[in-house]
Regions:
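Chalcogenol-based redox active-site neighborhoods
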Residues: 1-134
Length: 134
């Protein structure tokens, strides 16, 4: 279990290789990954409704893995739906995708949740915003 007995940052986003996800959200956590660790965070996890192969390639292409971010795919959207963070946008081909959010989880309990009002925004859920609340 990735969360038991640990302090973990999870940030969810609509999709690998998509605009804001690649240019704003992931980079915000790449910039702050070391600072989170200095504040006692055990892991920073990026979660997207994609398969693990896409997430591994995206990790390599963005350098997120080298920055210490664990890139996880929620291929069936089971976790995303389970926490109520799924949305559909059929005009752009998004079905059961993740809303954009960031959270701090302490021993399996969400202690901070920052959810964007729109998947095209990346301010409330950015790494710098979450870091400032710790």
């Amino acid at each position: 279990d990735l969360l038991a007995g640990r302090k973990v940052v999870i940030f969810g986003l609509p999709g690998a290789y998509t605009g804001k996800c690649s240019t704003a959200h992931v980079p915000s956590f790449m910039r702050t990954a070391d600072a989170f660790k200095q504040k006692g965070v055990d892991a920073v996890i990026c979660l997207s409704v994609n398969d693990p192969f896409v997430m591994a390639a995206w990790s390599k292409d963005t350098g997120a893995g080298d920055a210490g971010i664990m890139m996880l795919g929620d291929a069936s959207a089971e976790f995303t739906k389970g926490i109520g963070m799924d949305f559909d946008a059929p005009p752009v081909g998004f079905v059961s995708r993740s809303k954009r959010y960031s959270m701090l989880v302490d021993d399996g309990v969400v202690t901070i949740l920052n959810e964007e009002g729109s998947p095209g925004e990346c301010e409330i859920s950015a790494g710098e915003t979450l870091l400032a609340t710790l």
